[in-house]
Curated annotation (Swiss-Prot):
GO terms for molecular function: ATP binding; transmembrane receptor protein tyrosine kinase activity. It comes from Avian retrovirus RPL30. The gene is V-RYK. Signal peptide: none annotated. It catalyses: L-tyrosyl-[protein] + ATP = O-phospho-L-tyrosyl-[protein] + ADP + H(+). The modification Phosphotyrosine is found at residue 212. It is found in: Host cell membrane. This is Tyrosine-protein kinase transforming protein RYK. PROSITE patterns: PROTEIN_KINASE_ATP, PROTEIN_KINASE_DOM, PROTEIN_KINASE_TYR.
């Protein structure tokens, strides 16, 4: 008998094929040359689910095969070719060519560029970047504020985000690189919660919500653009400083849209008449002074990124150290108030939301009373002990119920400083089981 062996020849990397594919994109020979050492073989990249999609393109999850080792999880940015000219494709890839040599912990690193042929045999460019577990900073801030179970983000962490961005922008400005699109949406959160500056002009090809087209001028993120850039379309490092100030405001407000109530087409007149972003609620005066310095009318009067980094680091160092090694967790729920006519007994299951049922019950005070009227209770759980802050409708009265303190020797005090959190109509009583003085962070 004759043995038949079927096999598939191993695919080899063909430089000539890559050159032809890049050339078919219609980009310049100079750009083709720049991209040669970052081109990724399409067979090494597998695409997964769509992470984000917009008018002009999408971001997909992917896996990049490594010569040795396990595949690397990546993010892949693509363009919708039917919306773009060859010039815009060249701009898309030019940004990738610019960042390929960046090497800084607070600046995203380009992994490569991949060219894929569509079913119509049209070459489609894809930019491959590291996958960021927590996504972009703006989305993270929004989730922390608006999700069903909001996550408390301490002021120290917010300031650390700002310092990270300042470090990244200091590096870019030292290399005479203009970002021109700095915003919280264009900063990414690594697995260790450090921030890296990203999307050097790539985001406007994919996300269009924050961009505004005026006449025949290309879409611009006008609420982040410096006043001189709006007037004359002139960009300098000091224009990036202006955008950094707006980004600081975004972080301080945990993802709010700048200039609430002001339309895109009204921004220039608003700024021209001396108006600026208002101080966020519960923002430290020192922090607002730093961000305000970024919005001075004369670019030369604005600080450098090196100066901003120093100011922010000093402010961060002046704040009290975190109280525990673990992140502060806040559980917001409603506890019934005392009612003399009710003897209903509530267990812990009715106090702890389902999402937080794995918390140690010993760290949460069990309610000892009930009433149809609810009071908002914020429970701060950390390594050093537990704090209980109660907020009820109206002002406290003399006969108001005072909850039992969690530890012997604890006493009710008035919170006098609230560096982070929502505005409060009145000071709240707080019970602290810690032996030393501390602040209530809401």
């Amino acid at each position: 008998t004759t043995t038949v062996v079927n096999y598939t020849a191993k695919k080899s990397y063909c430089r000539r094929a890559v050159e032809l594919t890049l050339g078919s994109l219609g980009v310049s020979s100079e750009l083709q040359q720049k991209l040669q050492d970052v081109v990724i073989d399409r067979n090494a990249l597998s695409l997964g689910k769509v992470l984000g999609e917009g008018e002009f393109g999408s971001v997909m999850e992917g896996r990049l095969s490594q010569p040795e080792g396990t595949p690397q999880k990546v993010a892949v940015k693509t363009m919708k070719l039917d919306n773009f000219s060859h010039r815009e494709i060249e701009e898309f890839l030019s940004e990738a060519a610019c960042i390929k040599d960046f090497d800084h912990p607070n600046v995203i690193k380009l992994l490569g560029v991949c060219i894929e042929l569509s079913s119509q045999q049209i070459p489609k460019p894809m930019v491959v970047l590291p996958f960021m577990k927590y996504g972009d900073l703006h989305s993270f801030l929004l989730r922390s504020r608006l999700e069903m179970a909001p996550q408390f983000v301490p002021l120290q962490m917010l300031l650390k985000f700002m310092v990270d961005i300042a470090l990244g922008m200091e590096y870019l400005s030292s290399r005479q690189f203009l970002h021109r699109d700095l915003a919280a949406r264009n900063c990414m959160l690594r697995d260790d919660m450090t921030v890296c500056v990203a999307d050097f002009g790539l985001s406007k090809k994919i996300y269009s919500g924050d961009y505004y087209r005026q006449g025949r001028i290309a879409k611009m993120p006008v609420k982040w653009i410096a006043i001189e850039s709006l007037a004359d379309r002139v960009y300098t490092t000091k224009s990036d400083v202006w955008a950094f100030g707006v980004t600081m405001w975004e972080i301080a407000t945990r993802g709010m849209t700048p200039y609430p109530g002001v339309q895109n087409h009204e921004i220039y007149e608003y700024l021209f008449h001396g108006q600026r972003l208002k101080k966020p609620e519960n923002c430290l005066d020192e922090l607002y002074d730093i961000m305000s310095s970024c919005w001075r009318a004369e670019p030369a009067d604005r600080p450098t990124f090196s100066q901003l980094k120093v100011h922010l680091e000093k402010l961060l160092e002046s704040l009290p150290a975190p109280r525990g090694s673990k992140d502060v967790i806040y559980v917001n729920t409603s506890l019934p108030e005392e009612s003399p006519d009710s003897t209903q007994d509530l267990g812990l299951d009715s106090v702890i939301p389902q999402a937080d049922s794995d918390l140690d019950p010993g760290d949460i005070a069990e309610p000892c009373c009930s009433h149809t009227k609810a009071a908002l209770v914020a429970v701060d759980i950390h390594d050093g002990g537990s704090r209980y802050v109660l907020e009820s409708e109206g002002s406290p009265t003399e006969d108001a119920y005072v909850p039992q303190l969690p530890h012997e020797g604890s006493a009710w005090t008035e919170a006098s400083t609230l560096p982070v959190g929502s505005s409060l109509a009145a000071q709240l009583p707080c019970a602290d089981g810690c032996l030393e003085d501390s602040e209530a962070l809401l």
